[in-house]
Amino acid sequence: MKIGVLGLQGAVREHVRAIEACGAEAVIVKKSEQLEGLDGLVLPGGESTTXRRLIDRYGLXEPLKQFAAAGKPXFGTCAGLILLAKRIVGYDEPHLGLXDITVERNSFGRQRESFEAELSIKGVGDGFVGVFIRAPHIVEAGDGVDVLATYNDRIVAARQGQFLGCSFHPELTDDHRLXQYFLNXVKEAKXASSLK
């Protein structure tokens, strides 16, 4: 199984390490042709407007949308969650606009720039330490969206079919259960596409 990590900014190496720890091959993606042959893609954290500028500069917006349209799974963490969202509070336009969620940027407030919180994640388990760094949260989830985790009544992880997103940085701990959950989804999508 081959998983891409969008390598424009953010904790790219940490995601590669997590994917490899789960037994899959990781490929750092900086050009659209590198999307070919991938089974899934991780959109790492960082700063969402910077990532969007780089996506535009490298001509990746359409290829990323086509990758998703082909039924390939995508996992957005922190700023990557913002890239996935169809709606962003305070912005007219989404970035990739793939998942039926509304996201608010830096929504835990400046004084809580970074913190850790123990989460219970549906399908993953309890005692998962979420590392939040200038984190967004999901303000609203559409009907087809499965809420996987909340923190202080805010949605911090959700899944809609092939799209998985979380507010925190799962790659910054040695708990790879969420990466494994994503890889399981990739495996399911791969089996489904081979049956078509």
Swiss-Prot record:
Statement: the UniProt record of this protein carries the keyword Disulfide bond: no
SUPFAM superfamilies xref list: Class I glutamine amidotransferase-like (SSF52317)
GO cellular component: cytosol; glutaminase complex
EC numbers for this chain: 4.3.3.6, 3.5.1.2
GO MF term list: glutaminase activity; pyridoxal 5'-phosphate synthase (glutamine hydrolysing) activity
Binding residues for L-glutamine: 46-48, 105, 133-134
GO terms of biological process kind: glutamine catabolic process; pyridoxal phosphate biosynthetic process; pyridoxine metabolic process
Key words of the record: Glutamine amidotransferase, Hydrolase, Lyase, Pyridoxal phosphate
Catalytic residues (positions): 78, 169, 171
Reactions listed under catalytic activity: aldehydo-D-ribose 5-phosphate + D-glyceraldehyde 3-phosphate + L-glutamine = pyridoxal 5'-phosphate + L-glutamate + phosphate + 3 H2O + H(+); L-glutamine + H2O = L-glutamate + NH4(+)
Gene3D superfamilies assigned: 3.40.50.880
Pathway, per record: Cofactor biosynthesis; pyridoxal 5'-phosphate biosynthesis
Family: Belongs to the glutaminase PdxT/SNO family.
HAMAP family cross-referenced by the UniProt entry: PdxT
General function of this protein: Catalyzes the hydrolysis of glutamine to glutamate and ammonia as part of the biosynthesis of pyridoxal 5'-phosphate. The resulting ammonia molecule is channeled to the active site of PdxS.
Protein name: Pyridoxal 5'-phosphate synthase subunit PdxT
Native source species: Geobacillus stearothermophilus
Taxonomic lineage of the native organism: Bacteria, Bacillati, Bacillota, Bacilli, Bacillales
